[in-house]
């Protein structure tokens, strides 16, 4: 195994970039897919990134407190859904503001005294549990057939989406991450299969300190090609957050009208006289 220092540097550089300038740095999010399966990579957010004046992870996030914590959730979510192993240094799970000092302990009292840090700790706990309970995220973490882009070109909106595949095709997961501060209503995205989808995880859940832009209930496919897929769905996209969707049910697909069927309906049947003449 090898630490993917390229992923770490590109990702942290992108996350430190203020929101208006993120579209111009979009390729820092997607470049890792050019080499991510060349070796067995581990995605490190280690002690090296929070010492010697580099500051803690959360203090690198642009914006006010809410956006900084939302950025921390988006970063952790991106790391967890990205192919490869995961490495996190202690203190990341509570979003400690001071960088690590070898002569001091981690400030775990923050999660006891402040809701924002408690929400962050709860988020990381639930994200870790979700990861463990969904083998799709780790069964093929080092194999190219375990990952497929849906959209790696939406720089203007700072959104990426992809598919994670495991050993069971029925357990495939669709991941979307929005690195912009604006929520998106009625956002259309292509999906790999026709059917009914449900949201399994959303970083913007209010219990994690989010704003509550969720997708509740069933999400039905529409016969509208999108992102190179034959079908698509319309979802709510959380601000500075991500979500995981899964196909959970079947749905009857509407019959497509063809040119031949339309011509057949338009053609008038021959009259009896015409039929008799043809027979002669």
Across the structure, where does each feature detected by a protein language model lie?
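Conserved alpha/beta catalytic core and glycan-binding cleft of carbohydrate-active enzymes
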Residues: 1-101, 132-142, 146-204, 211-212
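Active-site rim elements
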Residues: 58-69, 107-118, 229-234
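A short small-residue
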Residues: 100-108
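C-terminal accessory region downstream of the catalytic core in glycan-modifying enzymes
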Residues: 106, 112-115, 119-121, 127-129, ...
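Acidic/aromatic-lined carbohydrate-recognition and catalytic surfaces
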Residues: 174, 178, 227, 240, ...
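C-terminal beta-strand-rich structural cap/linker in extracellular carbohydrate-active enzymes
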Residues: 216-254
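Intrinsically disordered, polybasic Lys/Arg-rich low-complexity tracts
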Residues: 252-280
């Amino acid at each position: 195994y090898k630490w993917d220092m390229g992923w770490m540097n590109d990702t942290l550089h992108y996350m430190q970039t203020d929101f208006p300038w993120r579209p111009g740095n979009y390729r820092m999010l997607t470049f890792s897919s050019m080499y991510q399966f060349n070796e067995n990579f581990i995605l490190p957010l280690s002690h090296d990134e929070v010492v010697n004046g580099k500051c803690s992870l959360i203090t690198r996030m642009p914006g006010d407190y809410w956006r900084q914590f939302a950025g921390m959730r988006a970063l952790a979510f991106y790391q967890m859904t990205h192919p490869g192993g995961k490495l996190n240094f202690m203190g990341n799970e509570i979003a400690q503001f001071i960088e690590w000092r070898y002569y001091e302990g981690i400030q775990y009292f923050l999660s006891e005294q402040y809701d924002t840090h408690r929400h962050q700790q709860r988020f990381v706990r639930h994200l870790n549990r979700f990861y463990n309970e969904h083998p799709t995220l780790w069964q093929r973490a080092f194999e190219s057939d375990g990952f497929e882009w849906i959209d790696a070109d939406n720089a203007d909106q700072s959104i990426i989406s992809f598919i994670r595949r495991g050993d069971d095709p029925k357990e495939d997961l669709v991941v979307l991450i929005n690195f912009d501060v604006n929520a998106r209503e009625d956002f259309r995205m292509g999906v790999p299969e026709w059917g009914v989808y449900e949201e399994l995880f959303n970083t913007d859940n209010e219990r994690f300190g989010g704003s509550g832009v969720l997708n509740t209930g069933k999400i039905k496919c529409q016969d509208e090609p999108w992102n190179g897929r034959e079908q698509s769905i319309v979802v709510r996209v959380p601000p500075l957050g991500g979500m995981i969707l899964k196909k959970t049910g079947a749905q009857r697909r509407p019959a497509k009208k063809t040119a031949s069927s339309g011509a057949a309906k338009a053609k008038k049947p021959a009259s009896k006289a015409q039929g008799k003449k043809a027979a002669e």
